[in-house]
């Protein structure tokens, strides 16, 4: 096998501007190794610039080869040399190349300790602090369990303290023994002899004697005592109930949350009694805890008093016997407690409870839990609700609230009860004057209709005068959805106060300035509405067709039939603006007479409106047998000149039969439940109807004939 191969040396130009159009070329050489088809680029100083594997490629002169980071232009071949091929490394030859380093051959080991180390004579000797456990002792848990006694002997803990260690690990928070750093480790022979001697001396050891060989003893390791919280026992062996499990509302006074453990902080029973300790000794002086009182009654009082008054009895572990010592009587318990009582001069470790953290007693939150009350008044919702229910039950006659904001009757429609009464109003004398239209044109009210999306507007079949008269009422409705029949009614039709007989008769319709307008205090600057007191007093009754009629209080009066007058039926509106039905064949007089804001006056200026009689009754839907009341007033001509009187044709009377009204404005018929919503809705209705009146006036002042043009209807 050849151990050398040819290497071709080429003179090249190279550049690192692979992406640029204008490239800067530099001189260099390229060596092509034929055994692995690798090209290496060198610069003019013989430094490696780039390399590339030219697999299945031939090097051609005057050609460009793209390397990894550069472009090489091959000019000519300079020379050919031979290079030795290095051997291919194999796994079998790894051991022949040399030894592996020590850190790869051996795992990590702790520092070595000589076997000739001195053994200390101190009985409390322990392992040095630099002695570490190996990995084998973590996995070998069974051996460490068997020889736990021997390990305890290696720490200098006698066999008499082993029971106290085991007892403290179950019932108390224990600490690990202090490790003295200068103590040395004892050899295995001394460990075996000490274990055998301790087993012979104390036959009360719960562990069986070790029959294994000395060499089977593992290296002792530091034992960690895990504290386990369990139920404490009283002095006669009965279990005290855990306050966490028996968490009642009546015996929370001895709650362990509210006070620290006074086990290590007080050496006298008097200090324990004074402190608010949630400990076992505190329960002796606490009357709320019944379990500790029963323990005192059943048990021996002498034993309890001895344990309570001895300063170190709370630290002795055997005062709380384990389950294995339950068969012992009280005498044995006293002996064990005296044996296990450590003397203050002894150098043995004193196994005590770890002190619990001092917890501040909560103030203001947990004062009295018996009454289920807290000092914070916002938390006593249950008590407040019970007290409120009791107060409400004691009240027999609960009076209705008479709040102006939440009315109890239809008086909320009174505009005087709203905020408009504090707003200065305009003078109402200008509102009662008739509207002066330009070019002497007649005031023609607009035909209004409620927009119906199901059927077009259809006028009711009636006489020509009836149809024309209803075109001046305000609207002509087609409401098959509401009544099932076509209906024509006034847009100003209102009977809000027909239900309330308690309305004071302060707003009876007057005739001094206008036959159907009541007294008002002016126009509201905020809403633009006329501010009225309460509506007219009336009662509600049914006609033959079931329609509603408003019969005002007072006598019914009418003029003689042969007097020169016209039938004008006045309909009540929310703001008392009248609309008229004039039955006459004279269309010119009709066009002049239908003014919504003022009634027609006589041609002579000397005649006043106040001379017309008072309107007493309005009947909307008369039956066939009952004729409508004839409301006859003098209607003077407004637009005729002062000196001339237009001829008045003899009038004839027609019975106006309206079907059942499609819309009702009664409070009981409105689709609202809340009276507060009704109060705000009524003002919105007033504003909407005022906008309709303004729209009528604006459209008629433009001089448009809106009788024929229905495109200008208000929607």
From Swiss-Prot:
Compositional bias segments (type: Low complexity): 202-213, 601-614
The organism encoding this protein is Schizosaccharomyces pombe (strain 972 / ATCC 24843)
GO biological process terms, alphabetically, are:
double-strand break repair; resolution of meiotic recombination intermediates
What's a GO cellular component annotated to this UniProt protein?
A: cytoplasm
UniProt lists compositionally biased (Polar residues) regions at 301-326, 472-481
Q: What is this protein called?
A: Uncharacterized protein C553.01c
What Pfam families does the record point to?
ZGRF1-like_N (PF10382)
Top-level taxonomy: Eukaryota, Fungi, Dikarya, Ascomycota, Taphrinomycotina
Query: Which InterPro entries does the UniProt record give?
Result: DNA_Repair_Helicase_ZGRF1, ZGRF1-like_N
**Where are the stretches annotated Disordered?**
192-216, 300-348, 461-481, 580-630
């Amino acid at each position: 096998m050849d151990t050398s191969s040819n290497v071709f040396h080429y003179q090249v130009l190279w550049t690192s501007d692979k992406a640029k159009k204008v490239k800067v070329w530099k001189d260099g050489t390229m060596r092509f190794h034929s055994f692995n088809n690798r090209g290496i680029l060198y610069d003019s100083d013989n430094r490696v610039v780039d390399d590339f594997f030219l697999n299945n490629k031939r090097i051609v002169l005057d050609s460009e080869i793209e390397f990894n980071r550069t472009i090489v232009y091959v000019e000519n071949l300079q020379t050919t040399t031979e290079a030795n091929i290095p051997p291919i490394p194999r796994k079998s030859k790894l051991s022949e190349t040399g030894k592996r380093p020590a850190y790869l051959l051996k795992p990590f080991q702790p520092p070595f300790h000589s076997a000739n180390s001195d053994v200390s004579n101190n009985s409390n000797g322990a392992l040095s602090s630099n002695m570490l456990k190996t990995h084998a002792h973590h996995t070998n848990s069974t051996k460490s369990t068997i020889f736990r006694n021997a390990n305890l002997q290696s720490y200098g803990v006698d066999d008499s303290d082993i029971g106290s260690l085991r007892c403290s690990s179950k019932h108390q928070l224990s600490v690990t023994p202090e490790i003295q750093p200068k103590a040395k480790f004892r050899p295995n022979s001394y460990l075996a002899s000490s274990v055998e001697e301790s087993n012979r001396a104390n036959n009360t050891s719960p562990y069986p004697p070790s029959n294994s060989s000395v060499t089977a003893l593992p290296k002792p390791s530091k034992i960690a005592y895990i504290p386990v919280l369990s139920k404490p026992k009283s002095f006669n062996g009965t279990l005290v109930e855990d306050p966490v499990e028996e968490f009642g509302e009546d015996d929370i006074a001895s709650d362990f949350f509210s006070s620290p453990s006074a086990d290590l902080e007080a050496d006298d029973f008097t200090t324990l009694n004074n402190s608010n300790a949630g400990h076992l000794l505190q329960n002796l002086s606490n009357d709320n805890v019944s379990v500790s009182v029963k323990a005192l009654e059943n048990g021996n009082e002498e034993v309890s008093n001895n344990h309570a008054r001895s300063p170190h009895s709370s630290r002795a572990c055997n005062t709380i016997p384990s389950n294995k010592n339950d068969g012992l009587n009280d005498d044995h318990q006293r002996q064990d407690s005296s044996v296990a009582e450590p003397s203050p001069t002894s150098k043995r470790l004193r196994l005590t409870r770890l002190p619990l953290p001092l917890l501040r007693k909560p103030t203001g939150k947990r004062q009295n839990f018996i009454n289920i009350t807290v000092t914070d008044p916002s938390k006593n919702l249950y008590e407040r609700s019970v007290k409120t229910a009791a107060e409400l039950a004691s009240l027999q006659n609960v009076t209705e609230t008479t709040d102006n904001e939440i009315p109890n009757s239809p008086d909320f429609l009174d505009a005087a009860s709203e905020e408009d009464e504090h707003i200065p109003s305009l003078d109402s004398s200008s509102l009662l004057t008739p509207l002066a239209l330009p070019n002497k044109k007649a005031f023609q009210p607009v035909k209004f209709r409620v927009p119906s999306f199901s059927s077009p507007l259809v006028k009711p079949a009636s006489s020509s005068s009836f149809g024309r008269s209803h075109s001046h009422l305000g609207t002509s409705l087609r409401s098959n959805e509401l009544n099932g029949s076509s209906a024509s009614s006034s847009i100003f039709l209102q009977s809000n106060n027909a239900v309330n007989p308690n309305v004071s008769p302060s707003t009876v319709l007057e005739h001094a300035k206008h036959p159907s307008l009541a007294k008002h205090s002016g126009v509201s600057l905020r809403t633009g509405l006329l501010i009225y007191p309460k509506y007219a007093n009336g009662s509600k009754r049914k006609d033959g067709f079931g329609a509603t009629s408003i019969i005002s209080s007072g006598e019914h009066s009418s003029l003689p039939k042969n007097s020169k007058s016209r039938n004008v039926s006045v309909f009540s509106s929310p703001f008392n603006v009248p609309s008229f039905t004039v039955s006459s064949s004279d269309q010119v007089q009709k066009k002049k007479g239908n003014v919504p804001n003022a009634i027609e006056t006589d041609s002579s200026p000397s005649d006043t409106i106040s001379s017309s009689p008072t309107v007493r009754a309005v009947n909307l839907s008369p039956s066939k047998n009952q004729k409508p009341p004839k409301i006859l007033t003098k209607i003077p001509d407004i637009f005729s000149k002062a000196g001339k009187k237009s001829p008045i044709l003899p009038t004839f009377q027609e019975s106006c039969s309206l079907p059942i009204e499609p819309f009702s404005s009664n409070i009981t018929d409105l689709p609202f439940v809340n009276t507060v919503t009704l109060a705000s809705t009524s003002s919105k209705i007033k504003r909407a109807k005022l906008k309709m009146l303004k729209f009528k006036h604006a459209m008629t002042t433009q001089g448009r004939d809106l009788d024929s043009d229905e495109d200008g209807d208000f929607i």
